[in-house]
Amino acid sequence: GYAPSIASPANGKFVADFEAANKAAPDLYGADSYGVLFFYKAAVEKAGSTDTDKVRTAMRGLQWNTPQGTKTMRAGDHQAMQDMYAMRVNGGKFEVVGQVKADAAIGADVCSRF
């Protein structure tokens, strides 16, 4: 989930920039789209190339910062992991009322195919 009130290093800047550009608060889709751009950027930097195979390899196990906090792309099953948030809606605004750490929010990586 996502809420503009999530306390992460990247979120404050993201919210301010998004609101200035769009005259509206960001939602999950805006936050995820923003975060995935930095995933690709981090993978290209790690690969030292934009070559598809090199970037794909660099994505395995990669960590990057997003408005929702740090995300990790698991190497085995390519599952993106992040902390998950429980929300309450008050007056049309999302309020974070709980948080589950990424490693507790998803099952173990048992994939050995990749």
Question: Residue spans of the language-model regions?
Answer:
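Extracytosolic ligand-binding ectodomains
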Residues: 1-114
